[in-house]
């Protein structure tokens, strides 16, 4: 016989949201045994966002790395980190959601990690209100220059971006307190 060994590249994460305030909370336990604690712990389920960039695919697990799959490499080739693309320049390393604008084909990363003060690298820490966008028609170029359309915007209201969606000739992005178009 033969054997097969499988190994995942990215943990699939939880399939449910888990929120708790201690072991044995609820009706289980008596007295202080099984009572709740003032400390809470939450484990977010794994939410993926994916969008087409032409015939290619850009994907992002919420709060994780951004990946790019090139259709011309074939179905047996896996996605690579956006930062590993040929010619990648200051591409975000993390984000909350990815969207491709349908009108002008910018890749948008909602909740991206910002470029550092020196302008030489990404910080690696998510700014929950930052929207970073690539150069038009170029998913690898993220450095804002006078010769391209890459850049970023920070939402002025709210504490985090909740989500975004393409609508008719616009992209809607909402935070916990505002809606942007």
Residue ranges of predicted features:
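Leucine-centric amphipathic alpha-helical interface motifs
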Residues: 5-42
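Beta-hairpin (beta-strand-turn-beta-strand) motif
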Residues: 14, 62-63, 112
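Beta-propeller and closely related beta-pinwheel folds
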Residues: 29-43, 75-181
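Hydrophobic or amphipathic alpha-helical targeting/insertion segments
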Residues: 55-80
């Amino acid at each position: 016989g033969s054997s097969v060994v499988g190994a995942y590249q990215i943990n699939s994460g939880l399939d449910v949201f888990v929120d708790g305030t201690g072991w044995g909370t609820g009706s289980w336990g008596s007295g202080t045994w099984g009572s709740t604690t003032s400390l809470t712990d939450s484990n977010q389920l794994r939410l993926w966002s994916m969008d087409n960039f032409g015939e290619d695919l850009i994907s992002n697990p919420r709060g994780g790395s951004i990946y790019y799959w090139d259709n011309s490499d074939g179905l047996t080739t896996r996605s690579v980190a956006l930062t590993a693309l040929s010619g990648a320049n200051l591409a975000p390393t993390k984000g909350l959601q990815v969207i491709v604008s349908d009108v002008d084909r910018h890749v948008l990363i909602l909740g991206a990690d910002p470029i550092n003060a020196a302008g030489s690298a990404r910080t690696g820490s998510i700014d929950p209100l930052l929207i970073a966008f690539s150069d038009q028609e170029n998913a690898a170029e993220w450095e804002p220059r006078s010769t391209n359309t890459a850049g970023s915007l920070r939402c002025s209201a709210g504490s985090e971006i909740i989500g975004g969606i393409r609508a008719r000739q616009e992209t809607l992005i909402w935070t916990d307190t505002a809606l942007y178009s």
